[in-house]
Design a protein with these regions (language model features):
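N-terminal beta-loop-helix "entrance" segment that forms/cooperates
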Residues: 43-56
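Short internal beta-strands
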Residues: 34-40, 77-79
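A glycine-rich helix N-cap at a beta->alpha junction
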Residues: 53-79
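Short, glycine-rich nucleotide/cofactor-binding loops
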Residues: 4-18, 51
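Glycine-centered short loops/turns at secondary-structure junctions
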Residues: 31-32, 74
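Histidine-anchored nucleotide/phosphate-binding helix
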Residues: 17-30, 37
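Acidic, glycine-rich active-site loops and adjacent beta-strand->loop/helix elements
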Residues: 9-11, 41-45
């Protein structure tokens, strides 16, 4: 199965900004699905180093860990 996750949330809502990546790398990817992530609108700022390192939502891993796992597993991230 192939799934493309999308978020438009940025730093103003760190939990919502992290959910798509969390579902992609800790959900679908772990059960063997092909996944990709689209960052649009305010979410594009999440790839900046200082932003990436500071975003921590509630109940999800920090954004830097999610992006590292995505990179480790070659998950495409579209901006």
């Amino acid at each position: 199965m192939r799934t493309l996750y999308m978020t438009t949330a940025g730093t103003s809502d760190p939990t919502r900004a992290s959910i798509s990546l969390h579902l992609a790398v800790n959900g679908s990817l772990e059960v063997g699905h092909d996944v990709g992530v689209v960052l649009a609108g305010d979410a594009t700022e999440l790839l900046k180093t200082r932003v990436r390192d500071s975003v921590e939502g509630v109940g999800v891993p920090p954004l830097r860990e999610l992006l590292a796992k995505a990179r480790q597993h070659n998950v495409p991230i579209y901006v």
